[in-house]
């Protein structure tokens, strides 16, 4: 056990602002954007190829980055950008997985953050309450993959954080991540 090597009386606290949950599926989102006509390639991509190597930026109107949620960037301006954003939001909100209906949430960053900084995406998508991992690679027969494009990984973030401690009552469910500072002040 990892704690056995620690000096006697050592206490350990593990805190995460997000929890963990089982991965239900993997979506090659750029593959889907290409099927829908929003993303174009300079040449036919190889299986699992990153989009940077093959995307035709002049003819593409949307491209996505993956992770535990998707970030979609619109390559258009004015009314065209508004229309593309509206259409993607509509399609992604009702997107179904091979196993059936999934809950997807599509946001503009300003809907989630008081202040949007840096090079923010135009849309952010949470697929199936973070149970479906969006990846940015392309070259697949289907946008729905059997597993993660970067190797084995069967879990994803969840919305609720967690904490674990070697002391006290770790069964509390009403604690917030910001409560950790006060908790540490009491025990240190």
What feature does the model see in each segment?
Residues 1-2, 43-48, 153-162:
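Short C-terminal domain-edge/linker segments immediately following a structured domain
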Residues 3-138:
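Secreted, luminal/periplasmic, and some membrane-associated catalytic domains
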Residues 5-8, 19, 25, 167-168, ...:
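…; additionally, a secondary subgroup of soluble metalloenzymes is captured
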Residues 37-41, 149-152, 187-188:
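Glycine-rich loops and low-complexity Gly/Arg-rich segments
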Residues 87-94, 162, 179-187:
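Generic recognition of well-ordered alpha-helical segments
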Residues 127-182:
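Low-complexity, glycine/alanine/valine/leucine- and proline-rich hydrophobic stretches
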